[in-house]
Structure formats: structure tokens, C-alpha cells
């Protein structure tokens, strides 16, 4: 944490050692999992303490496990604003496909009174080579969600893992969505197929890529260097980036457990390493 004063993340600080993040500046996390926030070492009391002095934050909460769609977790913090996406992640596929996809449609058609979240997108959805489900089944669910997104004109949040996944996903995107559709390709990093991602950004005019701590490959500096070179080579890339944490996943090794929270990982680690 060399760039930003850690104290300034949570309150006003008068030290002159580092850059201070203005307390009035809202922070933004483009991809996280609110219902899983407090399953590990982070707790609700610490979370509320971080916002007690007025720091505001906007979270894009990703409900990627269909069996948890109806388990709403409310943070009840006046300084926190949450927008929610609903989708079927390729590692968590249902056996009763038609029923669950219909549930997904009904969620966005506001047919469930017990869901009060502000719904903003379908996802995360896509293909994952580490999934226990076949690519054929993953592809079926991916197509169904893209079809629904097109019908309801909903933004899409993408998940792709495994180099073979990217071109397949890009082809399906072009088949099901028009070039102006709003798309956020989550978790782009040195292991992504960057040629496909470049083509994706060029084809879909309202497309964005999500960057989180997975862009830092401390055990593979060559890949990290190549990724950074690719990143700065993309025209107007600064307008195409969504900063995200994927919290509570992707804990960076550089942070201690007590430092690992949506604010610290979303601000300090990403910005500090980008300056390097």
C-alpha cells in the first residue's frame, strides 16, 4: 500500500506521507458477491465501521448461484448502494434447466415480491474449462441467457475461463446480441485470450472489461508484462475498464487477512500496482 494512505479510505486524515483519497469521493466495485461477504474472516461490524465516517460505496452484487437467487442479504448501511445481477454461472448449472431459466426471466419481469434488489444485468454467465459440467451443457445455458438478455434488452456480465472458452463465447455473442448491446466481460487477466478480447471490444461498442487482482501474476512476470503492454496498446482503454474485486474471492497475496476487504482490495492494490 505505497500509493494511498490507508486511513484516508475510511476517514479524514491529515498526515502528509501519502496521497489521501477524498472522503466525499464514492468508491465503486464493478463485480462482487454481497451474500458471501461475511463467510470468511471479514465481518459485518468491520464493514460498518469502514463506512461510519461518511465514505460511500457502490457495489455491483453478482448473484451467480441460481440456488441463492432468493436468499437476499441486506447490508442496511446508508452509505452503501447495491445494484444486483442475476445469472447462471457455468460452474453452477441446474438439472432442471427450463424451470430455472424461467425463474431467471420472472426475476427480471418483477414477478417475485420477495426480491427487492435493483436488478441491472444478466450474469455472470459464460464458459469455464474448470467446470465439472460439459462444454455442451454450459453452451446451452449460455445461449439461453444471451437470448433472454436480447429479448429484455438487459446488459450481460460474462465469465470466461480456459483459453478455448473465449472464441466460443465471442461467436455466440455475435450470434445473439447486436453490436450496441451493453456487455461487461468480467475478470480479464494475463490468462485471457487477448486477441479475442481486443476483437470483442472493437465489435461491441458498449463493451467493457473487468480488471481485478488476477491481473497480477507474481509467479509469471513475463505474462504480466505482456498483459500490461497489451492493455496500454488498446485505443481508449481507460474508457473501457471496470474496476472490480470479485470479493470475497481472489485475495491478493500482498494483503494480510485484516487488510482484505472490498475497499482495500478495490483501491489500494489495483491502483498501487498500476502505478508500478
Predicted regions and their residues:
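Mid-domain alpha/beta scaffold segments of enzyme catalytic cores
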Residues: 1-276
